Amino acid sequence: MAKLGTPLSPSATRVLLLGSGELGKEVAIELQRLGVEVIAADRYADAPAMQVAHRSHVIDMLDAMALRALIAQEQPHLVVPEIEAIHTETLVQLEQEQGLRVIPTARAARLTMDREGIRRLAAETLGLPTSPYRFVDTEAEYRAAVAAIGLPCVVKPVMSSSGKGQSTLRSEADIAPAWEYAQTGGRAGAGRCIVEGFIDFDYEITLLTVRHAGGTSFCAPIGHLQKDGDYRESWQPQPMSSAALARAEEISRAITDDLGGWGLFGVELFVKGDEVWFSEVSPRPHDTGLVTLVSQELSEFALHARAILGLPIPVIRQSGPSASCALLAHGEGVPYFNNVAAALRVPDTAVRLFGKPSVHGHRRVGVTLARAETIDEARAIARDAADAIGVELRP
């Protein structure tokens, strides 16, 4: 976009966020800084991005008619999916019928809404290296896939994120409960799953890849620690060989070029020595990229905002060893944070509290961030800051 309007005026540049969690909140803030009129939608009220948007809507984004009605009402210049649980076929239809601009493209949103579309594209169409895998619909197919792939392996619903419904199978005793959890823990309820073999990797990274008007740019690789498929810590830069980094960039460019459009992609990769395997890709900012709030001059959210608006990204500057640590809450209630001051007493630390309206079970409610002389020091400082904050859940 060569021109940007003024919010809440006839000239406004309107962006509709489909999904209003903590990542969408940071995108909304960056768009606000550029004078964009932001509309946030999600399935529940008072979601984090709604708190910083010009207005918001509560809808079931898997409901095709509700999604069409919202887009017709708001007439956005850009639709920016921030989660997977969206009726993406509607976006494809509106893109074809009306020229609706979906970020990065409606096809990319549809392919990445579940693990099957993107895995088949990566492995079967593009020939990228991946773990061995099978897709299954029934418990019998699941058990046959586990037997064929062997233990250890991982089972995940094809439509889920942040570890929901995901289990690691290490013994025969894990097989039955893992299937049960996969059928109850995913975003879209019971259904199709992927069974993946284990890769004996040294570490895993997220390579934030930005497609923009000037070409494709890469952020420094981000290392991360996962537990039960969910992000716990991330750090940047992750040390890796020049050969492995070149291969990671090659794989990331291949998958993002095929998906097309403009915006930031989070490409997840496994690395062992100089070998690299494709794991997953999200066509939007990535939770492990929260570290870029302190590790880069332009965070992943600022990069996404610039890219989707067609603005230049002449350089991506990394600020040195940095780390993030997720702040977790368990139970039921409204989060209340104690000892935030203690977490901020160490120089070069920061805290982001997401503003999630409630917790039901297990939820990430904030993140601590740190810069230091080394990655190990930054990780330790971020962990200590997270430990210092007590999360209390009130009725």
UniProtKB/Swiss-Prot annotation:
Reactions that this protein is recorded to catalyse: N(1)-(5-phospho-beta-D-ribosyl)glycinamide + formate + ATP = N(2)-formyl-N(1)-(5-phospho-beta-D-ribosyl)glycinamide + ADP + phosphate + H(+)
Gene3D superfamilies assigned to the protein according to its UniProt record, in alphabetical order: 3.40.50.20, ATP-grasp fold, A domain, ATP-grasp fold, B domain
One GO CC term, this protein: cytosol
Keywords per UniProt: ATP-binding, Ligase, Magnesium, Metal-binding, Nucleotide-binding, Purine biosynthesis
The EC number(s) this enzyme carries: 6.3.1.21
Record-listed N(1)-(5-phospho-beta-D-ribosyl)glycinamide binding positions: E22, L23, E82, D287, K356, R363, R364
List of residues binding Mg(2+): E268, E280
Pfam families reported in the protein's UniProt record: ATP-grasp, PurT_C, RS_preATP-grasp-like
Protein's UniProt keywords contain ATP-binding: yes
TM segment ranges: none
UniProt enzyme class: ligase
GO BP, sorted A to Z: 'de novo' IMP biosynthetic process
Residue span, ATP-grasp domain: 120-309
Entries under InterPro entries matching the protein: ATP-grasp, ATP-grasp_carboxylate-amine, ATP_grasp_subdomain_1, PreATP-grasp_dom_sf, PurT, PurT/PurK_preATP-grasp, PurT_C, Rudment_hybrid_motif
A GO MF term: ATP binding
Residues the record lists as binding ATP: R115, K156, S161, S162, G163, K164, G165, Q166, E196, G197, F198, I199, E204
Signal sequence range: none
Pathway participation: Purine metabolism; IMP biosynthesis via de novo pathway; N(2)-formyl-N(1)-(5-phospho-D-ribosyl)glycinamide from N(1)-(5-phospho-D-ribosyl)glycinamide (formate route): step 1/1
Assembly and interaction partners: Homodimer.
Membership in a protein family: Belongs to the PurK/PurT family.
Function: Involved in the de novo purine biosynthesis. Catalyzes the transfer of formate to 5-phospho-ribosyl-glycinamide (GAR), producing 5-phospho-ribosyl-N-formylglycinamide (FGAR). Formate is provided by PurU via hydrolysis of 10-formyl-tetrahydrofolate.
Protein name: Formate-dependent phosphoribosylglycinamide formyltransferase
